[in-house]
Amino acid sequence: VPYLGSFSCSDPLLTRIWDVGAYTVHLNMQEYVWDGIKRDRLVWIGDIHPETSTIQAVFGYDESVERSLDLARDESPLPKMMCGISAYSLWWIMVQYGWYLQNGNRTFLESQKDYLAELLRYFAGRIQENGAEDLPENRFIDWPTADKPDVIHAGLQGIMRMAFQAGEFLCTELGDGETARLC
């Protein structure tokens, strides 16, 4: 895979950090976008957002991203959450949004329409009357906050908001005004 993007600055350490990050993501780009290439070699959809941003900046379009998004969708028939974590399913929506904005692959987006709409409807049903999220699945954001329920709630609230904004845009693009209005 050719490196299309690059970074350099007056601080050689920052340039080296960028190079190592790009190389690490490159190693993870196999048939799918693997996470933890030395460790568990799984498609952790919750971690794919920074990876897809890096892929787009460094390599441009790569089919491994769409294969990974499809794999996560196909392995998570609703109401099952991706990797068993509701935040990961929310990240899937945001990655769809970013990938579509960057690549404009309408055919790929259309192939996500039914699942996307069903997922957004599920999440819309997990909002309490006071506007707070009420996600029952594994309430996980990241390891440093795993034992902090208030921080997890705030994180899920924010991630849910961003996912609904992304979902509204995608559903509007797909001509699904009914689901867009739920967002």
Summary of predicted features, one role per range:
Residues 75-91, 106, 124-183:
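The feature captures the catalytic groove of carbohydrate-active enzymes
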Residues 1-125, 130, 137:
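Substrate-binding groove/exosite segments of carbohydrate-active enzymes
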